[in-house]
């Protein structure tokens, strides 16, 4: 009998869950909401499970509603192994995928195919990563899985953390009618400022470049992180004071690490200046090893829900833009 061929793909899942964190305020609608509705986009409500401040939503896998974490820090969409069997995903036994938690430990997963529906948008033959069963609590173990960048691109979804929604092309939108691709391109009318994102080299993860105290810094934009985290390896070079906390970071493999806290001043992204920004600090060696900006520099950290909420940000991962502030 011919032995199956196993393909190993490597990716880093930067999805983070933090314990003992404060509450995150949720913004309202406004001009952006009205413009998206006028464009024919429909809103998909998101929610939060008990004990977790991050956003998740119910999406259909082969017609079955499952609750997924919305995680732009993951390049792939995964689903629990038991639920993959229950929903009838077609398993590809020739593929094995190796992923890593943000702290570096490897996770071996499989591949399965089935339909994924977010709102009225359907990807009929979507490639899911099959997450193995395990007894260790991870950053996604309370969910059926996580919706990553591949699903956001496949459905044309925009992530609106401040209002707790996703937006997808509706049946009467230009995209829904098949008159244009799912990528919007730049739309200055969706925010006060439009910040261009780049990818992390060969990886699809989204990088936002800026400066801190006049020095270049770059960050992974991660809707699956409760709070923003700066790599200790980078932070310590700025000689900024910090203090220890009782909070711990839990990554996708279940590993935990204590956090420090600091306050940053003069964090700038293009024309957007953030005069004061609170940040958590943790060693992020694996993240810096695999994620580099366009100049080849290792990334300096992860921008999470706190940054997106405070900045009233809308993420268009497919087009590579982050819209900051309500449009005028």
Residue ranges and their predicted role:
Residues 21-328:
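Pepsin/retropepsin-fold aspartyl endopeptidases
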């Amino acid at each position: 009998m011919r032995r199956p061929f196993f393909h190993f793909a490597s990716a880093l899942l930067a999805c983070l869950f933090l314990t003992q964190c404060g509450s995150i305020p949720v913004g309202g609608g406004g001009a952006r909401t009205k413009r998206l509705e006028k464009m024919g986009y429909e809103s998909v409500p998101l929610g939060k499970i008990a004990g977790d401040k991050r956003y998740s939503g119910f999406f259909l896998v082969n017609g079955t509603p499952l609750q997924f974490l919305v995680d732009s820090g993951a390049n792939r969409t995964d689903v629990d192994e038991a639920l993959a069997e229950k929903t009838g995903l077609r398993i590809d036994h020739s593929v094995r995928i190796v992923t890593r938690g943000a702290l570096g430990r490897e996770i071996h997963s499989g591949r399965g195919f089935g339909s994924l529906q977010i709102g009225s948008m359907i990807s009929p033959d979507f490639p899911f990563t099959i997450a193995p069963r395990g007894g260790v609590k991870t950053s996604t173990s309370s969910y059926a899985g996580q919706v990553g960048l591949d699903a956001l691109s496949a459905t044309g979804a925009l992530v609106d953390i401040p209002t707790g929604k996703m937006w997808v092309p509706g049946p009467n939108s230009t995209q829904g009618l098949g008159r244009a691709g799912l990528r919007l391109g730049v739309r200055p009318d969706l925010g006060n400022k439009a910040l261009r994102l780049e990818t992390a080299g060969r990886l699809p993860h989204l990088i936002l470049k800026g400066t801190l105290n006049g020095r270049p810094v770059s960050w992974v934009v991660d809707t699956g992180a409760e709070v923003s985290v700066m790599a200790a390896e980078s932070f310590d070079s700025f000689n900024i004071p910090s203090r220890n906390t009782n909070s711990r970071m839990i990554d996708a493999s279940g590993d935990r690490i204590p956090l420090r806290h600091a306050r940053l001043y003069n964090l700038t992204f293009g024309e957007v200046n953030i005069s004061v920004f609170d940040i958590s600090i943790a060693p992020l060696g694996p993240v810096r090893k695999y994620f580099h900006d366009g100049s080849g520099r290792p990334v300096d950290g992860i921008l999470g829900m706190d940054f997106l909420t405070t900045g009233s940000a809308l993420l268009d991962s497919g087009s590579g833009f982050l819209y900051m502030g309500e449009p005028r």
